[in-house]
Amino acid sequence: MCNRFYISLILINTLLFNQPLLAQQGDYLSGEVGIGLGAAHYFGDLNTATQLNRPKPAATLFFRKYLGRYIAARAGFSFAQLGYSDIYNTQNEVQYRRNLSFNTNVWEVTAQGDFHFFKFLPQERGFNFTPYITLGAGLFSYDPYAYLNNERYYFRELPVGTEGQNSPLYPDRKMYGTTALSIPFGGGFKYSIGGGRLNLSFEVLHRFTNTDYLDDVSTTYVDPNAFPKPPGGISVAQLLSDRSGDIGAPIGLPGRQRGNGSKQKDQFVTAMVMISFNLMSYKCPSGD
């Protein structure tokens, strides 16, 4: 009886006092789930100088799966507001007189690969910080709009687009869609906090896209006869196509360049502060 009692005490002592050590020895980082908040900025036909003077809000949700100490796969779902106006192009007289503007909401899903420069072990001092780079592919939705007389108009909902889309005078110009592809590329750094359970990160992610119509501006001005004529007035599409007359003499002559002619697709960038919760595993990782 006494032997059983002593054996029980030894087992209890082993479990109580050695369990944290065993857990730490077996713990390793298997993944992260987190959120991020920050700012987004657009680059394209209305912002050819790549100015960073009109940031708008952005947010993200993500899951990261570690494939080793240095490599991880990430899935993300992000939102960004984008917009710009020619009134900010004070150093370029032609663009300033063009007087175009746009806004759009972007919803994006991405798959990315992350590479850490340092071994990242959140619970070990000296290994709880690393810079990283990331590259991936994404799909996003967008639907640009502008305001006219304090009313919002979505460009795609107009019977004829601002560059003659859907007009029989320009049969080669089809209305653009609401989805496009992106290639996100960027980097950041992260630091483990909260005893190794949380990570605080800062990341800059630039997107190259395959559309030149984030801003509804790409090719040339069109013949005013391409736009339907409402009784006693000018159509909304025609007014939004050439807004130079709002601030001076109209410059939108048919055939004159309105955008950059698709020489370079539109782009956007996000900068975010992110916090994530570490998902731990007790199975030994495949490698260091």
Tell me the role of every PLM-derived stretch.
Residues Y70-A73, F120-L121, G196-L198, S281-P285:
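Repeated loop/turn-to-beta-strand initiation elements of outer-membrane beta-barrel proteins
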